[in-house]
Design a protein with these regions (language model features):
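A composition/biophysics-driven feature that prefers long, compositionally simple stretches
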Residues: 1-187
Length: 187
């Protein structure tokens, strides 16, 4: 695609990219290659929502607690171990975007993606707090109790970008640049 863009558009043209649909690494590689060819990148307009007017709603499966007898460790214990690794990596915040990582850390399962026991969510773990960004309609009383027991707060799925923007300037955030989208990275 990069080669086609460079050949077809030529220097001085602009390529619009939806930053929610490209990883950090993917964006940086694309940006480097296109800038070298004299092309610009524009990420400020969600053109997908503008043209895809009959887009299906987000999946709404209910979250289910994956019992720790099956996974061997409580969510609280996993968070403690994760915070130790974060400190070793000199990070005081971790943004989780991979759905399987979120399911494993929070001991939750769902059916939002066919043939994968995951929920559409984000996780934001700091040295003191953990927040699961998820549609609140997915949370049963059992799931809320499970998360409360582990000290995990919940927030609406759509609040992740404002939460990232509100972090202090000196926050050291760890992300997986292969899995995290560029829009969250920019937030």
């Amino acid at each position: 695609i990069n080669q086609w863009l460079k050949t077809t558009l030529g220097a001085g043209k602009t390529v619009a990219i939806n930053p929610d649909m490209i990883s950090i690494n993917g964006y940086k590689a694309l940006e480097s290659e296109l800038k070298a060819a004299g092309l610009n990148i524009y990420t400020e307009f969600d053109f997908i929502n503008a043209i895809w007017t009959d887009r299906p709603a987000m999946p709404q499966s209910k979250a289910v607690v994956f019992d720790e007898t099956h996974c061997g460790q409580s969510t609280a214990d996993k968070l403690t171990a994760l915070r130790t690794r974060m400190a070793d990596a000199n990070a005081n915040t971790l943004l989780l975007t991979a759905l399987d990582d979120i399911a494993l850390l929070f001991n939750l399962r769902g059916a939002d993606i066919d043939y994968n026991p995951v929920l559409i969510a984000f996780g934001l773990i700091t040295d003191k707090d953990a927040t699961l960004f998820i549609n609140p309609d997915k949370l049963t009383d059992e799931v809320r109790a499970h998360l409360d027991k582990a000290g995990v707060k919940t927030a609406d799925y759509t609040e992740v970008k404002p939460a990232l923007s509100a972090l202090a300037a000196n926050t050291r955030i760890a992300v997986d640049p292969v899995k995290c989208n560029y829009a969250l990275y920019k937030a």
